[in-house]
Amino acid sequence: MSTKVENILEELKSLNLLEAAELVNTIEETFDVDASAASGGMMMATPTSAPASAEVEEKTEFDVVLEEVPAPKKISVLKVVRPLTGLGLKEAKDLVESTPKVLKEGASKDDAETMKKQLEDAGATVIVK
């Protein structure tokens, strides 16, 4: 940064509120600009970024992933997995023994949380993605 710019910046830092307001008015008149237009542009940037965060929060489909099943808990987890997935005994057993596996894709938030609670109560480690 040049010395001239640094000096101007230091002078601006030393202004009180009344002097800063007077400076803004003088700049508006001298250069025929509107300082409120600059702040309006910044206000418009905020709503643009808000929908992006709203989209993240609006996730409606979740995957329920069976991460781990301890050996002593396999039978109790198997009893929960069968009615949740509609699988037969052999298929459910294979699924429980080959973790990590996706149990259900595209489940609603309520269904995913219910499945997670039932499986965790049976002793499994579950992740909802």
From Swiss-Prot:
Subcellular localization, as worded in the UniProt entry: Plastid, Chloroplast
- GO BP terms, alphabetized: translation
A molecular function (GO) term: mRNA binding
Kindly report the protein's main subcellular placement as a broad class. Answer: plastid
Q: Which InterPro entries does the UniProt entry name for this protein?
A: Ribosomal_bL12, Ribosomal_bL12_C, Ribosomal_bL12_C/ClpS-like, Ribosomal_bL12_oligo, Ribosomal_bL12_oligo_N_sf
Query: Which Gene Ontology cellular-component terms appear in the entry?
Result: chloroplast; cytosolic large ribosomal subunit
Q: Which UniProt keywords apply?
A: Chloroplast, Plastid, Ribonucleoprotein, Ribosomal protein
- What job does the chain carry out? Forms part of the ribosomal stalk which helps the ribosome interact with GTP-bound translation factors. Is thus essential for accurate translation.
Family the entry assigns: Belongs to the bacterial ribosomal protein bL12 family.
Q: How does it assemble?
A: Homodimer. Part of the ribosomal stalk of the 50S ribosomal subunit. Forms a multimeric L10(L12)X complex, where L10 forms an elongated spine to which 2 to 4 L12 dimers bind in a sequential fashion. Binds GTP-bound translation factors.
Name recorded for this polypeptide: Large ribosomal subunit protein bL12c
Q: Which gene is the coding source of this polypeptide chain?
A: rpl12
